[in-house]
Swiss-Prot record:
Keywords: Phosphopantetheine, Phosphoprotein
PTM sites of type O-(pantetheine 4'-phosphoryl)serine: 524
One Pfam family here: Beta-prop_ACSF4
Family in the record: Belongs to the ATP-dependent AMP-binding enzyme family.
Annotated organism of origin: Arabidopsis thaliana
InterPro entries named in the record: ACP-like_sf, AMP-bd_C, AMP-bd_C_sf, AMP-binding_CS, AMP-dep_synth/lig_dom, ANL_N_sf, Beta-ala_Activ/Resist, PP-bd_ACP
Start and end residues of each Carrier domain: 489-581
Keyword Repressor attached: no
Domain of life: Eukaryota
Protein name in UniProt: Putative acyl-activating enzyme 19
């Protein structure tokens, strides 16, 4: 028998290292979840004859209590600690040198019907067989990423990290505590890290489904999430249907198994489900057929040849239970004459595990799960014996008898319900339930604590004297719904609304004002349900755990919003208000050329609907352009120049006005060379939902317009000077792409997630024409003034050329992948370049109709960022999601490559004021400056937070120049964590220049949510969208 080493730590790098260290030593590991009650942890350590406990040193509080108990040796281990002690030759003997082979390599406990957990002895061959089967049928192709996020108490967690390590695939481990407290954050995690494969239980997917549906068809998940494995619970067909509509390109697998069979033994590919549903009426997705080297049979009655108990044999089989014979407690030898309709040959006289689950074989040969005959259930993917919960309850001195059942509501949401008979001397007041719940919290994991308690005088019995479970199941407790309560105008107070929502989430009749949500049965799934019902951030439920405390917080916030509304609506436009530093924004002044300091990441987004004002009033004295020397741009009315500014320094002008005119020296603003600079917010406009789109700023008729849309489907035209609204309209789908104007500036063009491209009147927003593509539109349209065409790509893999005057599509091009990146037009060569998520780059001749393809090139990774053309060489700059920056010639050959240190999701930035630099922003937090002609690195600057948006170079504001050198320019960069940085960049770089002389941060500001919008910076003003539901206007200010 191998020695057993317990691992007391959550999913982490330390955990993965510890697992492989134990295996390398030839021993077995036992996962211990730190969230389990201490009494349960000590019980498992005692019953397993543990030789050593390895605990994560970062969890000092949780680890040290084990040392104090002195039950066995404890090793504290942390990756953050530097090991300075030199180690000599190890005394360990590697497995290959040992005379014996270990019987099992891991020990995992499952709930037992006797009331005691049972330790399953799992084998290496079972784990490897599961991995090799997956790798053969669903191999890892290209650069993918796995996520390790499942609790270590669940058998499926092993394949999460084992599959990544054995296939040399990147493994991303999210903050386990954050996911536990805010289950909805898993969506942002999957998007941010472009996770390719996800393993989850259906109940978790059901909990986050409303948020997924609210966000609509999420292109980022559609492009990155290749495979989703569902296991641990029945997978409803209705849930698959919802998921498939949101993620049509994602492969969904339904796996079935248990800890005794290495986690999984059958599978069903949901791509076969539409075909199957034509011939079968089923409510849950089949569990399918056996995986490689596993044998699955049905043991049942002869009169039902295609139905019976699921029995499993093969390489997946474990070595039985700790301290038990292999041929006991469910492990039996079966013969052919006892099998009703076995699914494999050669199954006589073999050892099988009787799962206790019953299945039926469909005409296709697939198995479908139909239930259990014993009282073992699965909740949130965790298998548990109801008898163990009942045995624990009856240990409570106030309880005489207890029965626990699994119940489901009309939405198939499962929960545990306990029917309790109290001792005669016990007090049956409301406080007894609270006391029992607290007592249970120290005995069992949270998932095993009943959600609802029912006090009964006696348990109903059958005629044979046994507990009548069916009669108990019919004793339904009334629940109250929470739908639409937050919009109710009736007499119910906010407190009653909150309590109703809590009752609905916990499936209980009533709660008191001071009940602790988690003490009375709440868990992360119930918290997700409650947060969705109330429309609040899930983390608030963990912070304000009772209805009364949550009421106080929400009331204070509501009062503050109402006060702000009343104050702002009574002010006129020219009235002054105080500095906006009180609204949660952080502004600081940094000395010129100072280094970037990395601070803690701000809190994540809190998307909350409110009635806050459309804009904030401006203190014209405080933010007077006079603070900047001769600020002609924002003070003179812009003369009669017409031009449009959009992300990546893309400037579009009518045919009568060249781009150079729009940026001529007349518009130049100058700052003294040694002047200190700070940043202030001068207005923000509420967009009712997240603003991921980048702004389009247009100068026309002596006015400055800003066009932008949000996830709320609202598209707005705003006065860029004051923040007042010109007009707004509601589109049919969510907006994530940027807008563009047509050649004569008479219309503005914007796409949405419903696949529609709208042509709106510039002055009024009224609809002129709309074009329907076959997929979502996130790509910013591009205008070709010479031909009066609008070019735009779609998720349907097609590039469209649209004649907005004739209102028709004149050309289509299949691009082999979804088009997120805006095309680039080379007017000199009359060529257009387009890239797709397949990595394909295509050059099209647009000189004469019909248009035709010049060349096609397949690059190694998807392209999400817009393309850029260098003015001097007309090379095309492409940024790949794998971190490569590639320059291609007009003839389609690669000129140079540069590999950054992380993924790139945004396009490069170039400007005539920095002609010798291409700026690229990377997810690793770095901004790279590359030479356009050679690809050599000019400088690299790390702002300390991930970046998913493009930079912007202010072409109108600069520092006073030295006699021999060009003026230093200003560049704005926004991190995805919500920080807006302004860098000072030297245009002319000498080889002897230090890093600080090339680039340095001069100021920064912190917004209150994530930023995925690429900024636009004109004359010291920065326009950017944010996931706090606002579009912001920030202004640089010279410090006196």
């Amino acid at each position: 028998m191998p020695k057993v080493v317990a691992l007391y730590m959550p999913p982490s790098v330390e955990y993965v290292i510890s697992v492989f260290s134990v295996l390398r030593c030839g021993e077995a590991f036992l996962p211990l979840d730190p969230s389990w009650p201490r009494e349960r942890v000590l019980s498992l350590i005692s019953s397993s004859n543990i030789s050593l406990v390895i605990a994560c040193g970062l969890s000092s509080v949780e680890s040290h209590w084990l040392v104090e108990r002195n039950v066995c040796p404890v090793l504290l281990f942390s990756m953050d600690e530097k090991l300075s002690v030199e180690t000599g030759c190890s005394s360990f003997v590697w497995p290959c040198k040992k005379e014996r082979q270990r019987k099992f390599c891991y020990l995992m406990y499952t709930s037992g019907s006797t009331g005691k957990p049972k330790g399953v002895c799992g084998t290496e061959q079972g784990l490897l067989n599961r991995f090799l089967w997956m790798q053969e049928l669903y191999p890892v192709v290209g650069e993918q990423r796995f996520a390790f996020k499942t609790s270590v108490g669940f058998i499926d967690h092993i394949q999460e990290f084992l599959g990544a390590i054995l296939s040399s695939t990147a493994l991303v481990i999210p903050p386990f505590t954050l996911l536990k407290e805010n289950m909805i954050s898993i969506i942002d995690f999957l998007e941010e890290y472009s996770i390719s494969r996800l393993l989850a239980v259906p109940s978790m997917i059901r909990a986050i489904l409303p948020t997924l549906q609210h966000r609509g068809h999420n292109n980022k998940l559609q492009s990155c999430l290749k495979l989703v494995v569902l296991s641990g619970e029945p997978f409803p067909v209705s849930l698959w249907d919802s998921l498939h509509s949101l993620l049509p390109e994602t492969c969904f697998l339904n796996l079935y198994g248990s800890t005794e069979v290495s986690g999984d033994c059958t599978y069903f590919d949901c791509s076969e489900l539409p075909r199957l549903l034509k011939t079968e009426e089923i409510g849950s997705v089949p569990i399918g057929k056996s995986i490689s080297n596993c044998k699955v049979v049905l043991l049942g009655d002869e009169d039902k040849p295609y139905e019976g108990e699921i029995c499993v044999s093969g390489l997946c089989l474990s070595q039985g239970y700790m301290h038990s014979s292999i041929e006991s407690e469910g492990y039996v030898k079966l013969h052919n004459n006892s099998l009703c309709n076995h699914l494999t040959n050669d199954c006589g006289s073999q050892l099988y595990y009787r799962t206790g689950d019953y299945g039926r074989q469909l005409s296709s040969g697939d198995l479908i799960f139909i239930g259990r005959r014993d009282r073992t259930v699965k909740l949130n993917g965790k298998r548990m014996a109801l008898e163990e919960i009942e045995t624990t309850l009856e240990l409570n001195p106030d309880i005489a008898e207890a029965v626990v059942l699994l119940s489901r509501d009309e939405t198939e949401l499962a929960s545990l319900k306990a029917f309790v008979v109290l001792n005669k001397e016990s007090n049956s007041s409301d406080g007894i339930i609270f006391s029992i719940r607290n007592w249970m919290g120290g005995k069992l994991p949270p998932v095993m604590i009943p959600n609802h308690f029912v006090l009964v005088e006696k348990l109903p019995l059958t005629s044979s004297g046994k507990v009548d479970y069916e009669a108990l199941a019919r004793l339904k407790c009334p629940t109250t719904g929470a739908q639409d309560m937050m919009q109710s105008n009736g007499t119910n107070s906010l407190l009653q609304n909150i309590k109703k929502a809590v009752c609905d989430a916990l499936l209980v009749k009533e709660v008191s004002d001071d009940d602790d949500f988690f003490a009375i049965g709440g868990d992360s799934l119930a918290a997700a349900h409650l947060s969705h019902s109330l429309g609040i951030d899930m983390r608030l439920i963990y912070q304000f755990r009772s209805p009364s405390r949550l009421l106080i917080y929400l009331s204070e916030k509501e009062g503050k919003l109402r006060e702000d509304m009343q104050h702002n609506t009574t002010q006129k436009l020219d009235h002054k208000i105080e500095s906006q530093n009180g609204n949660g924004l952080v502004s600081r002044t940094v000395p010129l050329h100072s280094g970037v300091t990395s601070g803690p990441t701000p809190s994540k987004l809190q998307c909350e609907k409110n009635n806050s004002p459309k804009r904030l009033k401006i203190d014209y004295e405080k933010f007077s352009p006079k603070r900047m020397k001769e600020n002609k741009l924002w003070d003179s009315g812009f003369s009669q120049i017409q031009c449009a500014f959009s992300r990546c320094n893309k400037v579009h002008s009518p045919e009568s006005c060249s781009n150079e005119e729009a940026n001529r020296e007349y518009w130049s603003l100058e700052i003294p060379r040694n002047q200190m600079v700070s940043m202030q917010e001068i207005w923000k406009v509420h967009m009712e939902s997240c603003v991921d789109a980048s702004p389009l700023v247009v100068l026309k008729d002596s006015k400055t317009y800003l066009f932008i849309g949000s996830h709320s489907r609202k598209f707005s035209c705003i006065d860029a000077k004051s923040g007042s609204m010109y007009w707004e309209t509601i589109l049919e789908g969510r907006i994530e792409g940027s807008a563009m104007v047509v050649g004569d500036f008479s219309q503005v063009v914007i796409g949405c997630y419903k696949g529609k491209l709208y042509f709106l009147d510039f002055s009024t927003g009224s609809l002129c024409w709309k074009f329907q593509a076959c997929g979502e539109i996130k790509c910013q349209p591009v205008v070709d003034t010479s031909s009066q065409l609008i070019w735009c790509g779609s998720h349907d893999h097609t590039l469209y050329a649209l004649d907005y005057r004739s209102q028709c599509c004149v050309y289509k091009l299949q691009c082999g992948g979804s088009i997120f990146a805006s095309p680039a037009i080379d007017e000199g060569h009359s060529s257009l370049y387009v890239a797709s998520t397949s990595g394909r780059v295509i050059a099209v001749s647009i000189k004469d109709s019909p248009f035709h393809t010049l060349w096609l090139f397949e690059l190694e990774a998807p392209i999400f960022g817009s393309l850029c053309i260098t003015p001097s060489t007309q090379n095309v700059i492409c940024c790949l999601v794998d971190g490569q920056v590639i320059a291609m010639s007009p003839s389609g050959t690669i000129i140079w490559r540069y590999r950054t240190g992380g993924p790139i999701f945004a396009g490069p930035c170039m400007s005539h004021v920095l002609p010798s630099q291409v700026l690229v922003c990377c997810r690793n937090g770095c901004v790279y400056s590359l030479e356009p002609e050679s690809g050599c690195l000019v400088w690299e600057d790390n702002i300390g937070d991930p970046i998913t948006a493009s930079a912007y170079i202010d072409e109108n504001l600069h520092f006073e120049s030295h006699e021999l050198l060009a003026s230093d320019r200003l560049v704005t960069v926004c991190s995805s964590s919500g920080r807006v940085h302004v860098l000072r960049v030297r245009p002319s770089i000498l080889s002897r220049d230090s890093h600080d002389s090339k680039v340095g941060e001069i100021t920064r500001m912190e917004l209150q949510a994530d930023i995925f919008s690429s900024p636009v910076m004109i004359g010291g003003r920065i326009f950017v969208g944010c996931r706090d539901d606002y579009v912001h206007c920030l202004s640089l200010e010279s410090c006196r």
